[in-house]
């Protein structure tokens, strides 16, 4: 080997040694930096994982402007969204804990989930205490979809659960858009931010938590790593306790009840049927991520525990918690007034005149007879109800309802009926002559979908 070659090799060896020393210094510096940054400055231990950072990105992109818009719309909406933000912060803390910890016992997971239950219950309470608010649809959109938070205990497919909750929200956000599109851009932006947050959350879950909340098999003890949420939780409400038992992702309602159902453990899965658009049955009165919409609804309306209400509040007639009352009559109402019937059982409501709109929410074995409605008649989260139209109504909407009989007069045969996530629906129309019996027609519940070209073609299938 020549002297020149040896010199060249020594030069290369020296260069390699220099590079190795630089790498060693870099690593040492990085470790020190990491150690420093891991010092708890805000209650969290350890560096945040990519999933935590991405979750925060969703919050920054959608929830931050959503909060500002909520406060701008109305105090009650702002207050409710404050509780929503606290719940989201608690969920972020749980995701962070999961990224650093092994999957805990059910008892420990129960403690980790408690803040979500508490804040979700507050969201529902704010809605229930503001039923006369002009922003009731906004309050309901959040309250009825708050169950999206329970995806952290849904297995093996939490993504669809969030999609179901989004469907529940859209039942109300669509009303908001119908009323305010082109009139109030703040309302439109409010809807856009919330719905898009839920859509992006579903994508986020599919990417980072495909089969359930991802825990770190090499992590530490979840109990010791649990950070306290930035906002202290309010006094624990009388809401059902959250359960740590993972639930299947089928259809799940809202959170307070969502976690209430989860607390049943294995019993929950026996009636598995989450709430989604397809089951918006998030009957958040039955907000449980695994309970069948119909089942939960019934459970909640069976025994109203509050004082009965029958009063005109502004332009809205509120009829609530009536039991075995067959003599509820609204005589000569104003056409600008609306009628809201909530959690009534085995009762009859008569409306003698024209009103703007009618809503039955969470009622059981309740009937309503009315003459004319300018806008619509809506049935949500009900069981075994009857609607009789003696005059006219443009549309009837049925959502998350089990058992609905609709009696149409000759003047109302052009009424459009829209149904979703409902069953046992029948329409009775007059016969060919006055002496003929009513003709009963069943609203289809089963559909067949096929791909034609690049589009889906759906048609109802006849019942056997």
Curated annotation (Swiss-Prot):
Keywords: Actin-binding, Cell membrane, Membrane. GO terms for biological process: actin filament organization; aggregation involved in sorocarp development; cAMP-mediated signaling; cell-cell adhesion; contractile vacuole organization; establishment or maintenance of cell polarity; mitotic cytokinesis; pinocytosis. PROSITE patterns: C_CAP_COFACTOR_C (PS51329), CAP_1 (PS01088), CAP_2 (PS01089). GO terms for cellular component: cell cortex; cytoplasm; extracellular matrix; macropinosome; phagocytic cup; phagocytic vesicle membrane; pseudopodium; vacuolar membrane. It is a peripheral membrane protein. The keyword Cell membrane applies. It is found in: Cell membrane. SUPFAM superfamilies: C-terminal domain of adenylylcyclase associated protein, N-terminal domain of adenylylcyclase associated protein, CAP. It comes from the Eukaryota. Residues 215-249 are annotated as: Disordered. Residues 304-443 form the C-CAP/cofactor C-like domain. Gene3D superfamilies: 2.160.20.70, Adenylate cyclase-associated CAP, N-terminal domain (1.25.40.330). Its main location: membrane. One of its GO terms (molecular function) is adenylate cyclase binding. InterPro entries: Adenylate_cyclase-assoc_CAP, Adenylate_cyclase-assoc_CAP_C, Adenylate_cyclase-assoc_CAP_N, C-CAP_CF_C-like, CAP/MinC_C, CAP_C_sf, CAP_CS_C, CAP_CS_N. The keyword Cell membrane applies. Residues 224-247 have a biased composition (Low complexity). Pfam families: CAP_C (PF08603), CAP_N (PF21938), CAP_N-CM (PF01213). The C-terminus is responsible for sequestering G-actin. The N-terminus is required for the PIP2 modulation of cap function. May have a regulatory bifunctional role. Binds G-actin and PIP2. Involved in microfilament reorganization near the plasma membrane in a PIP2-regulated manner. Belongs to the CAP family. This is Adenylyl cyclase-associated protein. It comes from Dictyostelium discoideum.
